[in-house]
Amino acid sequence: MRIISGTNKGRTLKAPKWDGLRPTSDKLRGTLFNILQTRIAGARFLDVFSGTGAIALEALSRGAAGATCVESDRRAAALISENATLCREADRCVIIRDVVERALLKPLPGGPFDIVLLDPPYDYAHLDAAVGNAATQRAEGGIVILEHASRVIPPQPDGLALTRTVTSGDSALTFYS
């Protein structure tokens, strides 16, 4: 796992040493940031179900103004902190260790956000609610992105328009505005 582009290009990130985390592949992360390239500079980025922090750190490397990571697992939150330090981004990367459902119900540091990304476990049962609650963290004109299993039909929460879905192998990215 590495940072693909930007100021930290090529930097290797620490990976989890336990089962249960599914880091986004470098290929899918590259696809995501190719799509976001015109929006990322100066953006406020929210990474929900952050895992290793690789997506938030990629955003910072490519010019995002700041990133907030929400992660419930204490080991993963510690890993995000280690990776942010490795990338010299600890000062621009806020880590919230809390249950996602609770964290999204209150204003988060660094928000409102221009880009909100959710990468829940593929068997997560509350996609509709998670996407809808994450959307409340959006700045005006901001977007919400959901990474999910390509076999799953993406949710259509009230107040959001599904604008695009991109599939790569077993994974998909669905964009909402």
Predicted regions and their residues:
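Class I S-adenosyl-L-methionine-dependent methyltransferase catalytic core
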Residues: 1-177
